[in-house]
Design a protein with these regions (language model features):
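Alpha-helical support elements that line or immediately flank enzyme active sites
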Residues: 62-77
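Structured beta-strand/loop patches that form or line metal/cofactor-binding pockets in enzymes
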Residues: 17-50
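Glycine/charged-rich beta-loop-alpha catalytic/anionic-binding loops adjacent to active sites
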Residues: 44-55, 89-93
């Protein structure tokens, strides 16, 4: 399986790895088929700008690379702008992914949406965007 230089760079040197304590939004998604689990943390200011974004991913190299790239693509943008992130944009930013790894980019998109949904829930804003519920991991009680 051939990976682009960007995929390898984001796998070997992932950006924004870690957790944000008291994050305004936290999203967890997973895919049983591949075994990948992504957790995304968002720090959001009073103007709805994502000032920091971190992730923890348990999974393959493509899952780590797509998580890393997704954080880079949304940091500094508004929450509304982050919701426009697509898996295709993540793939393009990484200069492509093998077809069998495209699902990792879908998880990265869904992790961002899941974190935004958590933020919206915390501030009482309605969730007015589509969530792929089959990959969203239920909240721990």
């Amino acid at each position: 399986m051939q990976y682009s230089e960007k995929v390898m760079d984001h796998f070997m040197h992932p950006r924004n790895v870690g957790e944000i304590e008291n994050a305004q939004g936290v999203g967890v998604v997973g895919n049983a088929k591949c075994g990948d689990i992504m957790k995304m943390y968002l720090e959001i200011d009073e103007n709805d700008v994502i000032t920091d974004c971190k992730f923890k991913t348990f999974g393959c190299g493509a899952a780590i690379a797509t998580s890393s790239m997704a954080t880079e693509l949304i940091k500094g943008h508004t929450v509304k702008e982050a919701l426009t992130l697509t898996n295709k944009a993540v793939v393009e930013a990484l200069d492509g992914l093998p077809p069998v790894k495209i699902h990792c980019s879908v998880l990265a998109e869904e992790a961002v949406k899941s974190a935004v949904a958590d933020y919206y829930k915390k501030i009482g804003r309605p969730i007015d965007f589509n969530m792929e519920s089959d990959t969203v991991v239920p909240e721990e009680k």
